[in-house]
């Protein structure tokens, strides 16, 4: 597993994340995830509220790519990994409680990504280069 730095954790908390998955037919799906959060040093997670195409793709075994960027800072990160879908365990129940506290829709699932690779998206010579890889 690749490990998040404290800077990366703060960056994720303060910027919008975009995710990408791919269907069995090879169709790419891209969308924002405002509920993205750091679960621990090696995992990202979010509230899957719509149970739409991303959810289906993950159920079908798609890997997950998460990109987080800040235009003003010209800085960003890309995270790649495999996902476990949580629907009836302690992780899920804790996030249902969080959703209730925030007044947001109860998640259909909580996808948790084990981070296998971290790439730098900061503008410049290192853009797209791997920072850490499992």
Language-model regions, residue ranges each:
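Binding-site signature for planar aromatic cofactors or substrates
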Residues: 1-134
